[in-house]
Design a protein with these regions (language model features):
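Cell-envelope/glycan interface and biosynthesis
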Residues: 1-146
Length: 146
């Protein structure tokens, strides 16, 4: 419904990732660790940095089937520049109407422990999504875990 509503408003969204197996998460995390090791970080440092960008196996919200990564046909790279697209702005403004929250907001990185992900949305239901988004909270704050 959210993708259809965005399209009606002239914004084309594209599902990049939804449910992800633990095996796929392990593959993505290992690749991210190797990327950081190539910059000169130790194994432990690379693992800590990688975990800010890719959830370690067994910890990804994608395992639950409640998280989605949405991009556009013209901006398929999941990077911070995505936040400047009309699609990201539309999703942030309208996601709660469909039960989703922007899961990792830019101003909550110290709380979530995850880098800003303007493409990552988590389903929590309409009531909770509206409460979270209207108050400018992240999920940890809303659940009282911070």
């Amino acid at each position: 419904d959210m993708i259809a509503a965005a399209k009606a408003d002239g914004v084309e969204l594209m599902l990049s990732s939804a449910y992800r197996t633990k095996e796929k998460s392990a593959e993505l995390y290992a690749a991210q660790v190797e990327k950081w090791k190539k910059t000169g970080l130790s194994q432990a440092e690379a693992e800590a940095e990688a975990a800010k960008w890719v959830a370690p196996p067994g910890t990804s919200e994608h395992h639950t089937g409640l998280a989605v990564d949405l991009v556009t046909p013209t901006h398929q790279v999941m990077d911070h520049a995505f936040a400047d697209t009309e699609a990201a702005k539309w999703m942030k403004a309208h996601c709660a109407e469909y039960g989703f929250i922007l899961r990792y907001p830019e101003d909550k990185q110290d709380i979530t422990g995850i880098t800003f992900e303007p493409w990552h949305f988590r389903y929590v239901g309409v009531k909770d999504a509206k409460a979270i988004m209207s108050a400018g909270l992240c999920l940890e704050e809303y659940l009282g875990k911070y």
